[in-house]
Curated annotation (Swiss-Prot):
This is Large ribosomal subunit protein uL11. The lineage of its organism: Bacteria, Pseudomonadati, Thermodesulfobacteriota, Desulfovibrionia, Desulfovibrionales. One of its GO terms (molecular function) is large ribosomal subunit rRNA binding. It comes from Maridesulfovibrio salexigens (strain ATCC 14822 / DSM 2638 / NCIMB 8403 / VKM B-1763) (Desulfovibrio salexigens). GO terms for cellular component: cytosolic large ribosomal subunit. Pfam families: Ribosomal_L11 (PF00298), Ribosomal_L11_N (PF03946).
Amino acid sequence: MAKKEIGKIKLQIPAGSANPSPPVGPALGQHGVNIMEFCKAFNAKTQDQKGMIIPVIITVYQDRSFSFITKTPPASTLLLKAAKLQKGSGEPNKNKVGKVTKAQVKEIAELKAPDLTAADTEAAMKSIMGTARSMGIEVTE
């Protein structure tokens, strides 16, 4: 018989550095999950992506066991890294804070493809360009 699911937890955690402190500890603790077991498994799975923020969906079962799925880093994080910025513009319509090329946008779109609902790479690129525009990052040829 399949395990009974009692909850899903969505978190964004820096790769390879999950620890029991907030936000991880309280989120898992209220579902009765072994926090250190999750931290060790997550850190082992994401150690090659250090420095990136990784969204994770944790499924908690009735017997207090869990499974988790890691997603690709958020488009905003990838755009900031490509433009070599710390943060986006506070006024994206007035202040442009950086530039990325179409080639970089295509690279990000291909990396994000499994998590996007876009039909093809072109549509994924448009989605990423929209994110860039809302962050005050200019897309150049």
